[in-house]
């Protein structure tokens, strides 16, 4: 079983390896918040080109990765995972199913 510090280090490494950047802010416990945003444009009939954004914020609290999902600035939900690797795999799948390229 990994210690909280080992899990935290693994989480930071995975965030850096997958293009997430520190937002410069922290949560109520002082944990660093990471974020990444995807943007796509599509043609909408009678309107023209429309841009959509998908944003994922992630932090680790007491060894548990927590992620929040936003679409066009609206919070979709918050999820927690048992390990940083499971969280990253879930983020990849969520972003793919939302129609964005990771």
What do these predicted ranges mean?
Residues 7-10, 14, 87-97:
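Charge-rich, solvent-exposed alpha-helical interaction surfaces
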Residues 43-90:
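Intrinsically disordered, low-complexity regulatory segments enriched in Ser/Thr/Pro
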Residues 1-48, 78, 101:
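Negatively charged, low-complexity tracts enriched in Asp/Glu with abundant Ser/Thr
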Residues 33, 45, 57, 95-96:
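N-terminal non-cleavable signal-anchor helices
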């Amino acid at each position: 079983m990994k210690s909280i510090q080992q899990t935290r280090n693994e989480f930071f490494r995975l965030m850096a390896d997958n293009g997430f950047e520190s937002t410069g802010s922290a949560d109520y416990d002082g944990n660093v918040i990471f974020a990444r945003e995807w943007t796509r444009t599509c043609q909408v009939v009678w309107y023209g080109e429309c841009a959509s954004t998908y944003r994922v914020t992630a932090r680790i609290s007491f060894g548990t990765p927590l992620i929040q999902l936003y679409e066009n600035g609206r919070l979709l939900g918050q999820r927690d995972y048992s390990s940083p690797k499971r969280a990253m795999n879930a983020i990849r799948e969520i972003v793919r199913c939302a129609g964005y390229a990771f």
